[in-house]
Amino acid sequence: MLGAALRRCAVAATARAGPRGLLHSAPTPGPAAAIQSVRCYSHGSSETDEEFDARWVTYFNKPDIDAWELRKGINTLVTYDLVPEPKIIDAALRACRRLNDFASTVRILEAVKDKAGPHKEIYPYVIQELRPTLNELGISTPEELGLDKV
């Protein structure tokens, strides 16, 4: 969609160019051009927070998720400018446990701590919310493993 819009813009610029590539003054665009430019930049509907959370919980709860899909999901989730909700992290930790991938559980918890950044109250809150899951699955936090001192 974006490629087509760029092609239309390039064709329009070429059509206005003179013999030596200099742009001639073009007539003032009418209202149809304004509507067209608005359409060129629309990107569809945005996702609500609840839909975002549900999408990621569903992704990590897939019974047939493999190690590659798990890592891909974690990598994608970490690239967003947010700290994932505890229910998303819970689903990811359970997927790690189904795959017996302890290293990914530690990586997820370290990523959450890193994403919290200077807001020191976020990481303890997430760990508090995840404590029943961590105990159930037998997962230690990076602090309990001594990895925060390295």
Curated annotation (Swiss-Prot):
<dbReference type="GO" id="GO:0005743">
    <property type="term" value="C:mitochondrial inner membrane"/>
</dbReference>
<dbReference type="GO" id="GO:0006123">
    <property type="term" value="P:mitochondrial electron transport, cytochrome c to oxygen"/>
</dbReference>
<comment type="pathway">
    <text>Energy metabolism; oxidative phosphorylation.</text>
</comment>
<feature type="modified residue" description="N6-acetyllysine">
    <location>
        <position position="113"/>
    </location>
</feature>
<keyword id="KW-0349">Heme</keyword>
<keyword id="KW-0597">Phosphoprotein</keyword>
<keyword id="KW-0479">Metal-binding</keyword>
<keyword id="KW-0496">Mitochondrion</keyword>
<keyword id="KW-0999">Mitochondrion inner membrane</keyword>
<comment type="function">
    <text>Component of the cytochrome c oxidase, the last enzyme in the mitochondrial electron transport chain which drives oxidative phosphorylation. The respiratory chain contains 3 multisubunit complexes succinate dehydrogenase (complex II, CII), ubiquinol-cytochrome c oxidoreductase (cytochrome b-c1 complex, complex III, CIII) and cytochrome c oxidase (complex IV, CIV), that cooperate to transfer electrons derived from NADH and succinate to molecular oxygen, creating an electrochemical gradient over the inner membrane that drives transmembrane transport and the ATP synthase.</text>
</comment>
<keyword id="KW-0408">Iron</keyword>
<keyword id="KW-0472">Membrane</keyword>
<feature type="transit peptide" description="Mitochondrion">
    <location>
        <begin position="1"/>
        <end position="41"/>
    </location>
</feature>
<dbReference type="InterPro" id="IPR003204">
    <property type="entry name" value="Cyt_c_oxidase_su5A/6"/>
</dbReference>
<feature type="short sequence motif" description="SIFI-degron">
    <location>
        <begin position="2"/>
        <end position="17"/>
    </location>
</feature>
<dbReference type="GO" id="GO:0045277">
    <property type="term" value="C:respiratory chain complex IV"/>
</dbReference>
<dbReference type="GO" id="GO:0046872">
    <property type="term" value="F:metal ion binding"/>
</dbReference>
<keyword id="KW-0007">Acetylation</keyword>
<protein>
    <recommendedName>
        <fullName>Cytochrome c oxidase subunit 5A, mitochondrial</fullName>
    </recommendedName>
</protein>
<keyword id="KW-0809">Transit peptide</keyword>
<feature type="modified residue" description="Phosphothreonine">
    <location>
        <position position="141"/>
    </location>
</feature>
<dbReference type="Pfam" id="PF02284">
    <property type="entry name" value="COX5A"/>
</dbReference>
<comment type="subunit">
    <text>Component of the cytochrome c oxidase (complex IV, CIV), a multisubunit enzyme composed of 14 subunits. The complex is composed of a catalytic core of 3 subunits MT-CO1, MT-CO2 and MT-CO3, encoded in the mitochondrial DNA, and 11 supernumerary subunits COX4I, COX5A, COX5B, COX6A, COX6B, COX6C, COX7A, COX7B, COX7C, COX8 and NDUFA4, which are encoded in the nuclear genome.</text>
</comment>
<feature type="modified residue" description="N6-acetyllysine">
    <location>
        <position position="87"/>
    </location>
</feature>
<keyword id="KW-0832">Ubl conjugation</keyword>
<comment type="similarity">
    <text>Belongs to the cytochrome c oxidase subunit 5A family.</text>
</comment>
<dbReference type="InterPro" id="IPR036545">
    <property type="entry name" value="Cyt_c_oxidase_su5A/6_sf"/>
</dbReference>
